[in-house]
Amino acid sequence: MLRQILGQAKKHPSLIPLFVFIGAGGTGAALYVMRLALFNPDVSWDRKNNPEPWNKLGPNEQYKFYSVNVDYSKLKKEGPDF
């Protein structure tokens, strides 16, 4: 398959940016899904030892991908412990 892509790129050099952007998009999507699966508190891989991982998050921990206006280090806890 890689040989076929390289052959097409040699015959039609205008396809090279297309291959680069498709490869970068696929790689970015795979990395984002891996980040969600490993670091998101909504995902629990071990239900016996950690059934509710979202309860262990502190109020100053950021688990969003990107936050524009919120400084999580200055947030205070507003609720009971469970």
Swiss-Prot record:
Please give, as recorded in its UniProt entry, the membrane topology of this protein: Single-pass membrane protein
Q: Name one Pfam family in it.
A: B12D
Q: Which residues lie on this side of the membrane: Mitochondrial intermembrane?
A: 38-82
The compartments listed are:
Mitochondrion inner membrane
Q: Name one GO molecular function term.
A: protein-containing complex binding
* Annotated transmembrane regions: 15-37
Which residues are reported to carry the modification Phosphoserine?
A: 67
| Record topological domains on the Mitochondrial matrix side | 1-14
Location of N6-acetyllysine modifications: 10
Q: Which GO terms describe its cellular component?
A: mitochondrial inner membrane; mitochondrion; respiratory chain complex I; respiratory chain complex IV
Keyword list (alphabetical) reads: Acetylation, Electron transport, Membrane, Mitochondrion, Mitochondrion inner membrane, Phosphoprotein, Respiratory chain, Transmembrane, Transmembrane helix, Transport
InterPro entries in the cross-refs? B12D
What family is this protein classified in? Belongs to the complex IV NDUFA4 subunit family.
- Subunit-structure text: Component of the cytochrome c oxidase (complex IV, CIV), a multisubunit enzyme composed of 14 subunits. The complex is composed of a catalytic core of 3 subunits MT-CO1, MT-CO2 and MT-CO3, encoded in the mitochondrial DNA, and 11 supernumerary subunits COX4I, COX5A, COX5B, COX6A, COX6B, COX6C, COX7A, COX7B, COX7C, COX8 and NDUFA4, which are encoded in the nuclear genome.
Q: What does this protein do?
A: Component of the cytochrome c oxidase, the last enzyme in the mitochondrial electron transport chain which drives oxidative phosphorylation. The respiratory chain contains 3 multisubunit complexes succinate dehydrogenase (complex II, CII), ubiquinol-cytochrome c oxidoreductase (cytochrome b-c1 complex, complex III, CIII) and cytochrome c oxidase (complex IV, CIV), that cooperate to transfer electrons derived from NADH and succinate to molecular oxygen, creating an electrochemical gradient over the inner membrane that drives transmembrane transport and the ATP synthase.
Know the name of this protein?
A: Cytochrome c oxidase subunit NDUFA4
